């Protein structure tokens, strides 16, 4: 994946990440129990979660889940509906006038594909959502994706590659890309 980086397990960087995740999980749990009309407390907690003040025009409906916080930036007039998940270690940049439907997942992190490396840390790459994008309910945006200005992502879509500006994309497509080898070098599925 383009721009992919890795954090190896059992390193100072991975320990700092785990500590930050634990803090943000506590903060988002508090955020999700606040009265909906307590805007000042909500805005204060969002500032703690994201490590900086958020735009006054940002609207995030609870419940909201985030794992890192420091990787997310928001433009003006952004609306994020209920039940969204932001795994933002790799960075999530959201432009102006973006609408994000309920249950959307933006995940910038994953694990190495190779079996021998899968449990030795995490990989991450940024997500960029340009101005005036609408992401429909329950869509999933994967690491390294840019969604071009003015585009629409249909409900339930899984977006694993860049979306050109002013496009409408829908659906999911699962395509076998390659076979994985086991630690012995055998190709999975070939032993039948």
Name each model feature, range by range.
Residues 145-148, 163:
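Extended beta-solenoid/beta-helix repeat architectures
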Residues 1-57, 173-192:
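Terminal amphipathic alpha-helical/low-complexity segments used for targeting or macromolecular assembly
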């Amino acid at each position: 994946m383009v721009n992919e980086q890795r954090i190896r397990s059992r390193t100072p960087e991975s320990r700092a990440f785990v500590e930050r995740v634990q803090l943000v999980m506590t903060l988002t749990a508090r955020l999700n129990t606040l009265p909906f009309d307590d805007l000042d407390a909500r805005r204060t907690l969002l500032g703690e979660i994201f490590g900086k003040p958020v735009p006054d025009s940002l609207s995030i409906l609870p419940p909201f889940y985030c794992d890192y916080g420091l990787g997310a930036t928001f433009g003006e007039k952004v609306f994020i509906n209920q039940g969204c998940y932001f795994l933002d270690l790799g960075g999530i940049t959201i432009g102006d006038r973006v609408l994000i439907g309920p249950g959307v997942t933006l995940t910038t992190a994953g694990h190495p594909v190779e079996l021998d490396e899968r449990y030795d840390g995490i990989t991450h790459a940024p997500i960029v959502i340009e101005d005036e994008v609408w992401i429909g309910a329950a869509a999933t945006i994967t690491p390294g994706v840019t969604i071009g200005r003015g585009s629409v992502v249909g409900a339930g879509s899984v977006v694993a590659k860049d979306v050109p500006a002013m496009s409408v994309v829908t659906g999911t497509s699962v395509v076998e890309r390659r076979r994985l080898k086991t630690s012995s070098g055998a190709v999975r599925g070939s032993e039948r």
